[in-house]
Amino acid sequence: TVPTGKKSEVTFVLRGADKTYKQKVSVTPMRHWNVYLYNHAHVDIGYTNTHKNVEQLHKNNIIEGIKLAEETKDHPDGARFVWNPEVGWPMERLWQSNPEMQDELVEVMKKGRICLDASYLNLNTSICADEELFHVFKFTREMQRLSGVPSDVFQQFDIPGMSWGLIPVMAQEGVKYIISWPNTDRAGNAHKNMDGKPFWWVGPDGKSKVLFLQPGGYANSGSMGKGGETGRPWFGQRDPAKVPKVIRMGYANVDFTEKLTALEKENYPYDYTVLSWSLWDNNPLDADVPFAVKEWNEKYAYPKIIISGGHEIMSMIEEKYGDQLPVVSGDYTEYWTDGLGTAAGLTARNRNAKEKLVQAETIWSMLADGGKAPREDFDEAWRYILLGSEHTWCFENPTEPYFQDAIWKVKQSYFHEAEDRSIDMLDESLAPATDKSNGALGPKEGPANGGIAVFNTHSWPQSGVIRLTAKESLRGDKVLDSKGKELLSQRISTGELLVYVPDVPALESSHIRVVEGKCSLLGSCKIEGTTLKNDCLAVHVDRITGNIVSLLKNGSTYNYIGEGANTFSWLPGNVDEPKGDTVVSVAVGEEGPLAVELCVTSKATGCRRISRSVRLQAGQPWVEISNVVDKLPLVEKDGIHFGFAFNLPDSKTRVDIPWGVMEVEKDQWAQGNRNWLAMQRWLDVSNDTHGVTWCSLDVPLFEYGNRTA
């Protein structure tokens, strides 16, 4: 036996009948490696099978994981089986569907046989709303409370990148660690100079921090090789009875010496590595692993393999290396948010549902007079919103019609359910402010006969324009406030009545009443050709292109627009050959004292029709833009882009992200995405003298500088 504690010179001697051969060799000892093996099945909600079958498979993995942990309970340390559900969704679904198992689930968590990590789903975190991020941890916080076992690792699989704004939320929720396992496909620079290098990640508040580790891509153990050998009997199998409960093939290749030797050659500074063991996506667990690990550890002192959960891995790194690790700030800009562009309408529904839920919860606090909020109903609405933000969309094989249609149907339902629930919760929260219905038909003057309450759910005073439906404003076009003072109003082409309501106090309401007659007030809005004006701005739309070519503040000649704004272009996949639209008409949409609007109708490649409306409202220092694209269902990849070229040289672009503000480039990691970025509600482009704040209600994605995808 050659000693391995230090580098040694060893002489090999070979003696023959009449000759002796000697050779000196240098023996470098192998590091005393600990290999932490994280057993899981990657959780895609859909993608490889119907949602129902995927849910059943992951619930079964927990049940089988409990059995395998019991079977291997007498194995030596490191070889006892531990199952990691990866995210909270499989455990939560099992908790809800099998209440008789709840005590057992808590008990196996206490024993360390099931290790529950902190996130509910694998999410596009950068498109999550501020409040939404707290609901990511709701279920696992409850399980942590019941079990007393820390669920303090945010595991993110598949998705390259995650939002900087996650950090302060994690800190508040007691989640101390992140392990990121990004895919290697469509991942850009996500793996560049970062895999296997832990560091402290400081949040945008400059105070909160978590310990971050990116071991590499998931299944970096090579386990997908075995997954491929199985033929993936779980993939696209309609009958769940035909899916094996577990995978048993009598072997699992846990010889990682080649990987470890490569790390040593790269001067990797640590004595551990972290590997993911997953056979593929949504797969049955591999029951061979604990037996292969036991055999390996009994045969070799090192490398030692340790079947682990996330907390064990990260707490080891913190304890052993925490005070030696670098501190990093900035945004790990996500790559896979482009999927939202394939479902722009549904994405808009989810964004608006989030805002409604925030309003509903605020109004409940304002009106319930201390009454208990329907917390479970609110939480379930947020759960559907999270399912919309989850990273999977359709079937892995899009040419297979049954699964493609079945999976897409359920994915769409999450957005619709979230929208419906948000509307219901808003209606319920407003109930204390409503009058009793006056008979089956109601008053002939409409439901607003008793007046209208206008609520401000912001923590600052607010003025603005509200819309009353035709039924809510049957009595007339004139509106009075609670003191009888007339308010500026305008009946528009949709039949709705616009009303300017000034100075609603923070977290309070104002009362208005629709009365007979016409509005007698004069507003500041007017149209001159294709120029819209109010008392703050003048915006000019080019009659030929339909683009905004001029934006001036009143009293100034400075044009905030560069080459044009709200410009349409269609881009074929992977070819930088954009095509513009052809304007069919530019027409007046609205013209009155409170609002003026121009509507541009055009045709373009890849679309049946495009409409772009530009609107100003009296007293408001902003331009409202509404674009509607009637897109053709093309099979080949393509994209729709609206460009905004501002005349703001040497400017900086700052973006509203969850719980923070990110400056483009300055605050982005080198590993982050540059092709498209996500924002919450606004971005700001400013230099030392001028600036534009650009808000988007429906669309979270933007490109910076030029079309980049």
Language model features: what each stretch is:
Residues 468, 478-486, 566-570:
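Acidic, glycine-rich two-metal-ion catalytic cores of nucleic acid-processing enzymes
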Residues 455-475, 638-647:
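Surface-exposed beta-strand/loop patches in extracellular or lumenal glycoproteins
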Residues 424-468, 521-534:
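Surface beta-strand/loop "capping" patches
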Residues 1-451, 476, 482-485, 489, ...:
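Catalytic-domain carbohydrate-binding cleft regions of carbohydrate-active enzymes
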Residues 50, 216, 466, 517, ...:
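Residue-level detector of alpha-helical segments with a strong bias toward transmembrane helices
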Residues 457-461, 513-563, 628-630:
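Beta-strand-rich N-terminal accessory domains
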Residues 540-599, 692:
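An extended acidic
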Residues 16, 481-482, 534, 553:
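Structural motif
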